């Protein structure tokens, strides 16, 4: 009806209704009878309305735009007005500055013109003479100040030569500008990061002083003197580097020169100057300025200007001044001018004798004035001033006068230096105010500007070297360090007391300031390390050597006093050792005697451990709680001593020491570098450690270090930190409960974790307690997890940091596995220097070898490098240095299992991700050790010699046997895994498996059956995959050695895998990464980890294939964890997938676990993740195997390019299908391309885990392998055909993979997936391998 009605309506007015927009009224009326016309009308209405609105909006917009334009125009005009005013003000300012002189001159000129009109030419000349003389004096003063600042030709030119000198001054002034205004620190440098002013803190004052000095030299000498004094402070602080050397001599010369200047100008000038200097010394700048203004302002200007700069050319300028005085007297007939000339020059001499100048008014004037006063009398005091803590704050001066600083320190003329400091503080309240400030971030600036400059000029010559080093490294903590040094300077007469005090204050400061204390410690360590703070990282390696050597020397002998005088840092560190060592050496004397009884290696390792681990943990532990750690170490050590762990302690300590030596080599360099870099890494590690550890930068290491120290100490490996000996032996009186209490004291997080881990290690806690401790250990483990997670997170935070952290974690994982304390040390140390860790390790081993002659670093290094190529690599060699030194002890490697296993749970807690691969080996080792612990400590004692080897191997995640060329490829850990699987089932089972593993030729963990023979030393040559029989090291057959190495490493791997397997079994409980933490804790608990692992492993060796695959799962887990960091993901997958595929049981589970485990692996081997991420794509299998074996696969990869393909791959292959792979691959194993053939092979080997004889294998698997896998051999030989095309690794990997998938039909799918990954990896791998990626 509506339509009809509208239709009826439409005909009369249809067009208008449709076409025209309706009005509101029409719409209302039609609302009752709505029609299409109404719709059309409404539409028209709305359209019109919208158009109107849009048009209005556009109009408004135009109006607004117009307003905006007008506003902008007004704004521009307003700014133009502002600019006009600014220009006017600037013009007036400039004019005023010019007119200050010219106004008077203009007035004088007007008067002179009037006078000229009235007077004759002669009168005019007479009037002009004084003006000319004044102008000449001003010019000479300016030139002198410029020359003195620059010290170039100032001394060479006489007053007659002032014109030439002025030209020279013009040339020299820019230098003065930079002297006065030091350039900012290099962007990103430690000082740059540490100091808010970025080295330009004094710029504002210096700029004003530079401008006002030069502008106001003529204008207002008061400003000029003040600014010049500021400039002198700055220039001296800047020149201190150059001047400290010259100033030391020049100050003595100044004393002499002052004597000469005094003799020449004593009567009037020196007395006047000394009087003015005396007045000036006690007085502030205003007083000095007033005195100078009252006195001869121009003379004093000259004096101040010349004095600020003459320091360098004091004698030259004095010589120039004396003739200049005569000539100036001649030039300036007025006696006042001659007096001024004499007083400026004579006063210059006097100023130099006084050490005064406008620039030196308070800083140098006081220094030099006091020098004339005190230098004749206080010449020793001025020399003693250098010991004063603050003068040493200048880095340049410290660098220049390093030796001077130390003699001064040893001279400990702190009382005179304090006197002078007090004198300077008293004369200049502002300075004294600066005296506290110099300790601040800008100590250099403050000290430079203030008395500290005076002190610097005086003291900086000698002491600055010492404290300058420290403060150059840690200027941020200069207050603390300055105070420390003040205490030193004060207490240096009692050097040992000051050392103890410093160590206490340092411990307090470090305890109070986790990060800052660590930074301090780092800076102190840096002080030890490099003369140059920036170079501290590089020099830390060397200077740390020197410092470490003195430490090693001084620590064995009364360490605190000896190193105190040598290095400020060493003073503090030695005082750390002194107080720590005093504290702990007193306690460590007990442990030392005990540990001496244990192994002779421990003392040497102590030296390295004390040198490095003590340095690290002196920093860390002192930072954390010096006494707490001592008590914790004691209690822990007592637990171990009370337990049958004393042998383990000796071994663990040896391992920790050996590995700490190695870790110290690695880590200590890194700890030193790290300490130096911890500042640098404060950006990366600070955030990571602070964020992740929850502690300071060092909080992570502190947390982990407390846990490490507690754990490590509980594990005898702990003692090395402060008193590896002491702590491991102090324990005799302490109860496990005390350990728990001490550990809890050390750090809430680490304490619980440590207690739990220690109790777990010692079996003190039941499985439930251990599991409970596991969570608490998760706490400490969370630091390990944090380490693992940090390793992962650090991937984000700092690629190198994580890699370095990985490397650190690897080395620390290895070291922590041997001694968690080392792991934590390593974690704490390498993390900072992770980027340069490899180089540092390379150098650090040398350095630490030099530093730690006691450690078998040198013997170890030579032997290890030759024998550890695959496992040890360069760094492995370093770690293998101890391996090699423990190579002597290596025959005891079976003990290594037990020791490693005990230690590994703890270290695995910290380093689960890291340890998953290494930890797997070392877990098994560790668990085996509990078996041996249950069986008795004797194995550990017998392992004591191999404890270092175990440490190094564990730390390297390298079984010496695993280092064997074929053994390195054990990754699947087929045979050892089964034995290890038995280990996880129960400690008794483990001990049984320990026995069974040694029974197996390859089952012997570190070639245990051969003890040392099968161990890494044979394979340690980085360049040779084939083990060079180093005499006693290896079984005659490499097959047996492979088997022993594989089983030992795979036993370890299985133990680590056991952690992952426990993860796999308990994987629902925790994510892969997380549960390994529990697993390490459980591993430390052993019962819980065994319980968790027991279900899969209770079969023990029976589970060889399934357990291997199971372990392969856990390993792939480890590998998967490594995946994050590793292009090695491919490798962990290839490796994990190989092991997973090889153990078909893991077919479904391995990917997730392998990913988790791989992460752990890569975490365990940060270097691998570093280098492997780049290299692992190509090295997928090798780096992984290398990861298991080598914490430093990068170097290994480089060295292993030729040897590692055999060494690593063969080492890792032998246990898994890799024996046959080793055959095919060994044929090409020397070839870079062999790695990819090996990658598929490990998968096959997993299946045909029996040794596949590699006819071409360097490791002579021909005999054992032929018996094991002829079929896989042929298959792998077929793959070897593709292996010939190493570049086409995909062909090899595909052929090998297809074949591998056949033997691994169990996990054929997983194998195919992972092999496809391998193919991809191998596609990339061959190029890298061809280029020597491995």
Curated annotation (Swiss-Prot):
Motif LFa 7 per record, residues: 686-698
Region (Sufficient for interaction with WASHC3, WASHC4 and WASHC5): 1-219
Ranges of biased composition (kind: Polar residues): 513-530, 584-594, 601-611, 908-919
Chain positions covered by the region annotation Sufficient for interaction with CCDC93: 347-594
Chain ranges for the short sequence motif LFa 2 as given in the UniProt record: 441-457
Motif (LFa 3): 476-485
Positions occupied by motif LFa 4: 531-542
Short motif (LFa 13): ranges: 1194-1202
Keyword flag Protein transport: yes
Superkingdom of the organism of origin: Eukaryota
Chain ranges for the short sequence motif LFa 1 as given in the UniProt record: 358-368
Intervals of motif LFa 8: 835-843
Region named Required for interaction with F-actin-capping protein subunit alpha (CAPZA1 or CAPZA2 or CAPZA3): 1024-1042
Biased composition (Basic and acidic residues): 289-324, 625-639, 818-830, 894-906, 1203-1225
Residue positions, PTM Phosphoserine: 157, 159, 204-205, 209, 284, 388, 533, 538, 613-614, 723, 747, 752, 783, 798, 870, 873, 1049, 1067, 1084, 1109, 1169, 1172-1173, 1333
Chain ranges for the short sequence motif LFa 11 as given in the UniProt record: 1124-1131
Disulfide bridge map: none
Residue span of motif LFa 14: 1227-1233
Positions of the UniProt region annotated as Interaction with phospholipids: 932-1334
Subcellular compartments: Early endosome membrane; Cell membrane
UniProt keyword annotation of NAD present: no
Motif segment (LFa 5): 566-577
Composition-biased stretches (Low complexity): 201-213, 541-561, 1297-1311
Function: Acts as a component of the WASH core complex that functions as a nucleation-promoting factor (NPF) at the surface of endosomes, where it recruits and activates the Arp2/3 complex to induce actin polymerization, playing a key role in the fission of tubules that serve as transport intermediates during endosome sorting. Mediates the recruitment of the WASH core complex to endosome membranes via binding to phospholipids and VPS35 of the retromer CSC.
Name this protein carries in UniProt: WASH complex subunit 2
